[in-house]
Amino acid sequence: MSQVLLVTTNYWPEPTGIAVYTTDLAEMLQTEGHRVTVLTSLPHYPWWKVPSEFAHLTEGTRSHDGVEVIRANHLIPTKMNALLRVRFETSLWRNLRRVSKTKLGNDYDMVIACIPTVAAGIIGKKIARSLGIPFGLIVQDLSGAGAKQSGLRG
């Protein structure tokens, strides 16, 4: 049985695209016999806040459908522009990094990062490199929507 670390910004209970995909991926790997840990953010998308029904999903470790889920606190802007996008990504990076150093073990066989956020990719790669294990990157979205939400044109 291999031990997989999935690093992503979007995970259950978020109801849209990337969270649905990463949740299905983690649960499928777990069903296939792998031990899966997810390092993720607070549930915030598409609401840009933590809804009251998910307020109990604060920073810390919990299990959901057999998958260990480790969440990190972070800035959640209520509106998005270019500056707030940078602050959001920076907050994700700092807090995922901090939590990865205090809550994760070193017994993983591989790290998978699922992005559109740069933070998840960077943290996943650094963890894999520090443990000397394989790293996989799934590019789910190239942040075109993020650029549009931030008021950037291209």
Residue ranges and their predicted role:
Residues 23, 27, 31, 98-102, ...:
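Short, well-ordered alpha-helices that flank and scaffold nucleotide-derived cofactor binding pockets
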Residues 6, 38, 71, 137-139:
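Hydrophobic residues in well-ordered beta-strands that form the structural core
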Residues 1-61, 65:
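N-terminal subdomain of nucleotide-sugar transferases
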Residues 85-97, 110-133, 137-140, 144:
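An aromatic- and histidine-rich active-site surface loop
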Residues 9, 13, 77-84, 131-154:
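Acceptor-binding helix/loop patch of EC 2.4 sugar-transfer enzymes
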Residues 3, 109-110:
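Structural motif
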